[in-house]
Amino acid sequence: LKHIRERIQDEGMYYVLLDEIQLVPNFHEVLNSLLHVRNADVYVTGSNSKFLSKDVVTEFRGRGDEIHLHPLSFSEFMQGYQGDKWNGWREYYTFGGLPFILSLETEQKKSEYLKNLYESVYLVDILERNKVRNKAEFDELARIIASSIGSPCNPTKLSNTFKSVKNVTVSSASIARYLSYMEYAFLIEKSVRYNIKGKKYINTLSKYYFSDLGIRNALLGFRQQEESHIMENIIYNELRIRGYHVDVGMVEERTTDRNNKTIRKQYEVDFVANQGNRRYYIQSAFAMPDEAKTRQETASLTRIDDSFKKIIVVKDDIMPKRDENGIVTIGIMDFLLQPDSMDY
């Protein structure tokens, strides 16, 4: 603080940038002191939301703004990538959108950078900050989440996975804590299930997506690169970058069988994207090669009885089209590269 004050020598505006402020003991006091310097514009950065978003926003409510920086979107990535869009797509879904990746020339350098970033930054920060004693347990959970992106799960289900696959007992309470640590460190994001017709959240199962797919792939040694699951994660990230709150949708339908017994069936909508009074229902469908697959992907959308836009994103490089139910099908490239792609 003394160092900063000594350099503010006149009435001109000074810009103070403090990186990883959460590493400074009693950083609230430092920021409070700087708030009284009228000609200082202070920018604080950090890689752990628990010690920034929760503490700083609460402490300095009304006296500052929070900006959440994401890795590069695909369109931003392509502005720095030298090559065609499909080569860029393969590069992006393999090595992710951290800006430094664009400056590395070989696949080996990119993979080493991402592995080191996870091991020496993410993992160390999470373990030390939260005093996690069982590194192997936490690390294994991160890999399980990485290998099952887009799959509904909860702490109890993950605890059972540890028991059945790894023959290790990890309590659901411990897993819930570990997941929250990953979220606070911006490693993953949680998307909660939402009953569209019932207009309420369902807290039984959620989905987790990686903020950067390069980190996700590095966790798995660049194996398990199922393009369909990765595409779903990329669409989720794109929606978040565009400022949408994203839930996993569920449509419930009740019918009766020939014995007049009630049958309850659930249909999933990959994403319910909300922003103000706007809402979009979005399906990630890697391919729809035949009528059966098309019926499968549209089944949940046709059962939603409101007027919000319904979109299916496919990997095929197609012209956007709209069917008789008003459902728009659009290719992944148009969806990611056109800023108004959701308004077709």
Regions found by a protein language model. Name each.
Residues 48-52, 72-75, 108, 317-318:
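Conserved nucleotide-binding/hydrolysis micro-motifs of P-loop NTPases
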Residues 1-15:
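Short glycine-rich substrate-engagement loop in P-loop NTPases that contacts/grips substrate
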Residues 174-344:
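A cross-kingdom feature that marks ATP-driven nucleic-acid transaction machinery
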Residues 28-44, 58:
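Conserved catalytic/switch belt of AAA+ P-loop NTPases
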Residues 33, 50-66, 80-82:
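Short regulatory helix/loop adjacent to the ATP-binding pocket of P-loop NTPases
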Residues 75-252:
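Interdomain hinge/linker elements that couple catalytic modules in large macromolecular machines
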Residues 20:
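Walker B catalytic acidic pair
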